[in-house]
């Protein structure tokens, strides 16, 4: 079994663990209503995704 030759320094440990740290999700403002939404998702308030209206797409799929 392999064993480490040197002790890992505190800086190496901290930089390695920094990649696992929790980060707040990045939000953007909706172009239509201005509410904050996560990226690459439809707006929960108005239902738009970029230029397309999500509510119209759902209604067409049901009909």
Swiss-Prot record:
Keywords: Ribonucleoprotein, Ribosomal protein
Signal peptide: none
Gene Ontology molecular function: structural constituent of ribosome
Keyword Iron-sulfur: no
Any coiled-coil regions, as ranges: none
InterPro entries: Ribosomal_bL32, Ribosomal_bL32_bact, Ribosomal_zn-bd
A GO term from the CC aspect: large ribosomal subunit
One protein family per Pfam: Ribosomal_L32p
Record-level GO BP terms: translation
HAMAP family found in the cross-reference section: Ribosomal_bL32
NCBIfam families xref list: rpmF_bact
Family affiliation: Belongs to the bacterial ribosomal protein bL32 family.
Name of this protein: Large ribosomal subunit protein bL32
Source organism of this protein record: Akkermansia muciniphila (strain ATCC BAA-835 / DSM 22959 / JCM 33894 / BCRC 81048 / CCUG 64013 / CIP 107961 / Muc)
Gene: rpmF
């Amino acid at each position: 079994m392999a064993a480490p030759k040197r002790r890992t320094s505190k800086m190496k440990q901290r930089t390695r663990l920094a990649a696992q740290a929790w980060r707040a999700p990045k939000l953007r403002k909706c172009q239509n209503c201005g509410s904050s939404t996560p990226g690459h998702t439809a707006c929960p308030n108005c239902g738009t995704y970029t230029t397309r209206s999500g509510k119209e797409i759902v209604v067409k799929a049901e009909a």
